[in-house]
Amino acid sequence: VPAPWTDAAIVPAARRFMNMVGQVPIVVNREVEGFILNRLQGALLNEAWALFEEGYASVEDIDLTVSHGLGFRWCFMGPFETIDLNAPGGVADYARRLGPLYHSIAKARSNPKPWNEDLAGRVEAERRQKLAIDQLPERSAWRDRRLMALLRHKNTQSDT
């Protein structure tokens, strides 16, 4: 996040350096609470908690929707590139076709609820049925190995 007094040459130079060392830098044009990743993750998490709380799906089915649906695509491309490819006429076509639906969905969640202890306890109970608390370190290590394998794969592929 460049400050107002940051020299204009610093951000592109920092981006080049980060790319050179194998990182994928994100430029945040101005300060925003939570930065970019946490805000996007927060939107998805808030909807996941609400869908579970309102009885639309189980914790497992919500996780599967993300890991085998959105996450499957999003590990290679972001939301805008995804929708650009999901309509014959690209992003503008997608926005015309589905913008009203997504706007209606967003309006329905204009007053998000906090994640309360009761709800967290219910989610916790479903998760513990799938994975005992003492198995978290082993599952985390499994996740990390999978992430490293995915990273190796992505690093060997072209973006085009």
Indicate where each model-derived feature is located.
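Conserved phosphate-handling catalytic cores of large alpha/beta enzymes
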Residues: 1-10
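A broad detector of the eukaryotic-type serine/threonine protein kinase catalytic domain
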Residues: 1-2, 26, 49
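NAD(P)-dependent Rossmann-like dehydrogenase/reductase catalytic/cofactor-binding core
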Residues: 9-12, 19-31, 54, 59-160
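AAA+ ATPase "lid" subdomain C-terminal helix
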Residues: 42, 52-54
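Structural/interface elements that position substrates and couple domains in central-metabolism enzymes
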Residues: 20, 37, 41-47
